[in-house]
């Protein structure tokens, strides 16, 4: 069961460039021009968004354990959370935490105390979440003047494409292979202070691809670029990316990004299979959530 594609146009409001994050040492900057070259007046920017989600084949009935939200507030806000499936071993539904986390983020996005800051929004949404469980999260907020602010905990990801090339990508945060940083109901896990924060200058025509690890574990960068370049409609490209990821995840012979990383980290088939010429291959079965957003003039 695939969640139907949705499309929306995000309106604009009054610009603001302030970012007052409590952990500035973890903030990365990507600027394409010197401050003297930045024009004080420019067209306001917003997002045209397409979303598609496909649950894990064994989790279709409950809709999977990923969750997401998209808001039309200010230049546009979007986020993905991936519930950690290991909680099922303790008879806890892993989807509850991720869904409540996203519901809280959506509700609090225009809260005055959040100050349109991804760190504060992650913190307040996490604090308000009462379900047992844990989740990875990525959240992006667009300033109408073309500043994209990103907060990431774990291995959900975001890539920024311009003129057919990836010019920026978040990096996954992991304790070790296949064990990502995560927000949790347990006090020993990560918080917003452990998040990776980035500030990226975007321009009209840029395309943002955001998703859970079910996308990036199964789809290579060149496939993402090819699909987004050939299919400029965001609803269509999000659907195609999700379908390719889901297809690769079920292919036991596919040389997926996940399989390549696993082998690079020392994980492989038993020795007797290696003698027979076998190696670890295949995609990673998982929920797949894809958000594709095009930067447009308001």
Swiss-Prot record:
Binding of Mn(2+) 1 occurs at: 82-83
Q: Does the keyword GTP-binding apply?
A: no
Cofactor names:
Mg(2+); Mn(2+)
Q: Which residues belong to any copy of the PPM-type phosphatase domain?
A: 48-295
A GO molecular-function descriptor: metal ion binding
Record keywords, A-Z: Hydrolase, Magnesium, Manganese, Metal-binding, Protein phosphatase
What Gene Ontology cellular-component terms does the record carry? chloroplast; chloroplast stroma
* EC class: hydrolase
Q: What does the record say about how the cofactor binds?
A: Binds 2 magnesium or manganese ions per subunit.
Q: What's the EC number here?
A: 3.1.3.16
Q: Which residues bind Mn(2+) 2?
A: 82, 213, 286
What SMART domains does the database record attribute to this sequence?
Answer: PP2C_SIG, PP2Cc
Q: Which domain of life, per UniProt?
A: Eukaryota
Catalytic activity field: O-phospho-L-seryl-[protein] + H2O = L-seryl-[protein] + phosphate; O-phospho-L-threonyl-[protein] + H2O = L-threonyl-[protein] + phosphate
Q: Which GO BP terms, alphabetically?
A: cellular response to light stimulus; peptidyl-threonine dephosphorylation; thylakoid membrane organization
PANTHER family to which the protein is assigned, alphabetical? PROTEIN PHOSPHATASE 2C (PTHR12320), PROTEIN PHOSPHATASE 2C 26-RELATED (PTHR12320:SF60)
Q: Which family does it belong to?
A: Belongs to the PP2C family.
Q: What is this protein called?
A: Probable protein phosphatase 2C 26
Organism name: Arabidopsis thaliana
Ranked from the top, the taxonomy reads: Eukaryota, Viridiplantae, Streptophyta, Embryophyta, Tracheophyta
